[in-house]
């Protein structure tokens, strides 16, 4: 039935065109932003998950920065420790050369040893990066580098860290008061064993005692007997071994940091891919849909135009 008051065909065509325009707007939005889910209204669950994952990735980026800073500190400590090892080895050669020497020659040798001792302190003092020094400390015994971030099943944040046993690698400790808590180079070591011992005491030149203690930092060959100098040599040997262990520990930490940095980088990439799977638009698909919807839009306009012409056709009937 034809009517001049109601045009069902035009209404149907208008509804179809409106639906096409809405779909076209959605596709154009996806193409312009690159997101299939750009707002919570698009898909609340996916948007929430993606937002949380993006936030986690920002935290992981901060963790990556922390690892980079830690790596720089470790590099600084390792470089300084290597230099210190070279200096202590030089001291060892000088102590060995002092055996059997006259006091005049011992004084000359001691002048060189003292220069190395001063350089050792300077090396340890300058092992500083961003205000942190693990070789020359003032009471610091432990430190840590933030190395990991995750969430548990309840959503609570969990942080992981790489612990630094500063006590095991420090060369000097200004706050230490006993031989066993002092740094590797300054704590007195028993001349008989080379081990740091709280019962060790300063030796008397020329007289060997069971409690004689020596430290690389304060070593002095002038006035001491050959037997005492041999004990000094034992102390320097054990000190070198301890420093080598410390350098090995530093190197192991550096390797852990490098591994964790690589893992964190891969984890961030994985999260980015996961977010993309949830919210990114498939541009090939959207491009195809855009073309189809544009055709539908043109057809809808033509259909609406034809439907609107029905009233004109009714008028022509009366004109006949």
Regions found by a protein language model. Give the residues of each.
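Alpha-helical coiled-coil
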Residues: 2-19, 23, 292
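Amphipathic alpha-helical coiled-coil/heptad-repeat segments
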Residues: 1-10, 36-43, 47-269, 273-280, ...
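Short loop/turn microsegments at loop-to-beta-strand junctions
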Residues: 130, 290-291
């Amino acid at each position: 039935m034809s009517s001049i008051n109601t045009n069902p065909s035009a209404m149907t065509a208008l509804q179809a065109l409106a639906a096409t325009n809405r779909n076209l707007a959605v596709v154009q939005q996806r193409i312009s932003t690159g997101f299939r889910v750009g707002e919570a209204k698009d898909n609340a669950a996916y948007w929430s998950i993606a937002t949380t994952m993006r936030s986690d990735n920002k935290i992981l980026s901060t963790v990556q920065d922390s690892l980079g800073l830690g790596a720089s500190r470790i590099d600084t400590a390792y470089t300084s420790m290597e230099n210190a090892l070279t200096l202590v080895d030089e001291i060892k050669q000088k102590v060995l050369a002092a055996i059997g020497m006259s006091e005049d020659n011992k004084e000359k040798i001691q002048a060189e040893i003292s220069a190395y001792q001063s350089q050792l302190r300077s090396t340890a003092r300058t092992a500083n990066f961003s205000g942190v020094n693990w070789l020359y400390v003032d009471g610091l015994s432990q430190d840590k580098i933030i190395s990991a971030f995750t969430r548990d099943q309840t959503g609570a944040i969990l942080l992981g860290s790489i612990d630094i046993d500063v006590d095991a690698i420090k060369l000097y400790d200004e706050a230490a008061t006993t031989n066993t808590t002092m740094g590797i180079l300054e704590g007195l070591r028993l001349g008989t064993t080379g081990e740091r011992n709280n019962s060790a005491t300063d030796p008397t030149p020329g007289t060997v005692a069971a409690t004689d203690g020596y430290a690389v930092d304060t070593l002095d060959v002038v006035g001491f007997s050959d037997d005492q100098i041999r004990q000094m040599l034992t102390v320097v040997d054990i000190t070198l071994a301890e420093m080598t262990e410390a350098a090995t520990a530093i190197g192991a930490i550096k390797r852990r940091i490098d591994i964790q940095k690589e893992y964190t980088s891969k984890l961030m990439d994985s999260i980015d891919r996961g977010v993309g799977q949830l919210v990114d638009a498939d541009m090939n698909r959207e491009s195809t849909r855009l073309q189809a919807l544009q055709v539908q839009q043109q057809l809808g306009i033509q259909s609406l135009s034809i439907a609107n012409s029905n009233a004109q056709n009714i008028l022509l009937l009366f004109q006949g």
